[in-house]
């Protein structure tokens, strides 16, 4: 269902070299997106919000990081899932369809993390010329991601429109394949 939009731009200007930008330090307990590790019902550990009538909520994020070494900029992004903020109203009655809907929220976050990695890889700039470019590119990615998540819930009626849900699944999986060159090596 809806995504919790907690955003943490983790600026890791540590001077540790471009390789350090390949791994972003995630918040404690966060689950890093991985094609080999789909979400399971037990991952949804948060308490349901009584004010929301949704059956479940996925709290995903795109964490960003940057390094400078020898005045050379390198940046990356990583999709993550926050179990403590994600919930399912009645875990015993979570259907496979609902779990697929929630997984696709996480998959959409990964699509936008890959798009951001693609943009960051194309930024051939020095750190002293970086200015607010990293912030602007990251914020634009977050905005586009949020819009896609909202469109997904609206178009599928939170997964209740099965035909539209199937179409979104096909589209998102195709986008993941198209952006495979920007997947993390062990994701």
Model-derived segments and their meaning:
Residues 1-9:
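Bacterial N-terminal signal peptides that target proteins for export
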Residues 11-13:
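Gram-negative bacterial Sec-dependent N-terminal signal peptides
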Residues 80-117:
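Mid-length scaffold segments of soluble, non-membrane domains
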Residues 89-91, 122, 127:
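Substrate-binding clefts and substrate-entry loops adjacent to catalytic sites
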């Amino acid at each position: 269902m809806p995504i919790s939009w907690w955003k943490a731009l983790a600026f890791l200007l540590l001077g540790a070299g471009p390789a350090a930008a390949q791994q972003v330090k995630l918040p404690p307990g966060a689950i890093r997106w991985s094609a080999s590790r789909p979400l399971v019902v037990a991952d949804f550990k948060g308490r349901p919000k009584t004010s929301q009538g949704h059956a479940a909520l996925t709290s995903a994020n795109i964490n960003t990081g940057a390094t400078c070494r020898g005045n050379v900029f390198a940046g990356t992004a990583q999709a993550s899932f926050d179990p403590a903020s994600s919930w399912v109203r009645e875990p015993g009655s979570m259907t496979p369809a609902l779990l697929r809907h929630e997984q696709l929220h996480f998959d959409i976050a990964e699509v936008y993390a890959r798009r951001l990695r693609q943009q960051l890889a194309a930024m051939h700039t020095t750190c002293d010329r970086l200015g607010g470019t990293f912030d602007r590119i990251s914020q634009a990615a977050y905005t586009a991601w949020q819009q896609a998540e909202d469109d997904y819930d609206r178009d599928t009626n939170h997964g209740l429109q099965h035909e539209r849900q199937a179409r979104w699944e096909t589209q998102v999986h195709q986008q993941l394949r198209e952006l495979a060159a920007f997947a993390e090596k062990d994701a």
